[in-house]
Amino acid sequence: MNIEILASKIHRAVVTDANLNYVGSISIGEELIKAANLIENQKVEILDINNGERFATYVIKGKKGEICLNGAAARKVCVGDVVIIVAYASMKFKKAKKFKPTIVHVNNKNEIIKE
């Protein structure tokens, strides 16, 4: 049996921009993408601490320190909102019990403070 389990998390990132006229996605700085063990086009869930919104989108590479929601997702956040970005993986139950997710903590400038 496979189950969904937390694979990666960027904890308490700050939204730096919201671009309604872009095709879609979340732009994340490359250093955070790598640190969180994410890849471009990977599905992620966004949890907005400020307004309680939870929604899915996909990752694209952005500028250093950038957390920008694009397209329709831009309507779900405000610049300055604190968000948690999570990705899940499907794996066998036994493997999932031993699996350790990648968790990256950032400061209010989206700089890594703890991995």
From Swiss-Prot:
Keywords: Autocatalytic cleavage, Cytoplasm, Decarboxylase, Lyase, Pantothenate biosynthesis, Pyruvate, Schiff base, Zymogen
Highest rank taxon of the organism: Bacteria
PTM annotation, UniProt: Is synthesized initially as an inactive proenzyme, which is activated by self-cleavage at a specific serine bond to produce a beta-subunit with a hydroxyl group at its C-terminus and an alpha-subunit with a pyruvoyl group at its N-terminus.
Active site, renumbered: S25, Y58
Co-factor(s): pyruvate
Cell compartments where the protein resides: Cytoplasm
Modified residues (Pyruvic acid (Ser)): S25
One GO term describing the cellular component: cytosol
BP GO annotations: alanine biosynthetic process; pantothenate biosynthetic process
One example GO MF annotation: aspartate 1-decarboxylase activity
Binding positions (substrate): T57, G71, A72, A73
Function, in words: Catalyzes the pyruvoyl-dependent decarboxylation of aspartate to produce beta-alanine.
Full protein name: Aspartate 1-decarboxylase
Organism, scientific name: Campylobacter concisus (strain 13826)
